[in-house]
Amino acid sequence: MFAVIKTGGKQYRVAANDLLKIEKVEANVGDIVEIGHVLAHGEGENVTFGAPFVDGALVTAEVVEQGKNRTVIAFKKRRRQNSRRKIGHRQLLTTVRISEILLGGAKPAKKAAVKAEAKAEVAAEAAPKEAKAKKEAAPKADVTAETAAAPLFKAPKGEPDDLTVIKGIGPVAAKDLNEQGIITFAQLAKLTDKDVAKIDEHMPFSADQIKDWREQAKELAKK
């Protein structure tokens, strides 16, 4: 006899004595756990399907081991922002051996210590709420970080120059430079190689672009 069960948001086809890795169940090694979400059961070609679960059907399993899955690496990179993030995750797993497939409300031979699907459902419901809370908190953190971040350079007093006169600097680039404290041709002309490297690291402009603007700014600053 086999059964199709649902636990931890996944479906498994199981039979007696099968070894199975499911999402972590809070139980000790040797404990019996109950899986009451039985979607179908059958033997050979005779299969009974539930709507969605089969009434009175129950699968019990013995906890064999508590462990973790292999590490999954998530790598995120944002173009032209020099932002890279690497996150590793290891899913907690419980290895169980299927003990019995019970039908018609039959009672298990051994009393279960815990119901597997109950724990899995609580974890599954908690995960979206936690993710939503983090998602709502993220924009606030970004706004705080942006507010707290100081410009790369100190803007001089006086009237700013029109940086768009320099070939290669458009309105958007000029605005970005102004926000970082660069507002005059003289500033651009006096940029050191160290300053160029700083802009290259923190702004979406290449070192070659900045050096070209610096040379143009030197000529404009003389006028």
Swiss-Prot record:
The keyword RNA-binding applies. GO terms for cellular component: cytoplasm; ribonucleoprotein complex; ribosome. SUPFAM superfamilies: L21p-like. GO terms for biological process: translation. Transmembrane segments: none annotated. GO terms for molecular function: rRNA binding; structural constituent of ribosome. InterPro entries: bL21-like (IPR028909), bL21-like_sf (IPR036164), Ribosomal_bL21 (IPR001787). Keywords: Ribonucleoprotein, Ribosomal protein, RNA-binding, rRNA-binding. Part of the 50S ribosomal subunit. Contacts protein L20. This protein binds to 23S rRNA in the presence of protein L20. Belongs to the bacterial ribosomal protein bL21 family. This is Large ribosomal subunit protein bL21. It comes from Mesorhizobium japonicum (strain LMG 29417 / CECT 9101 / MAFF 303099).
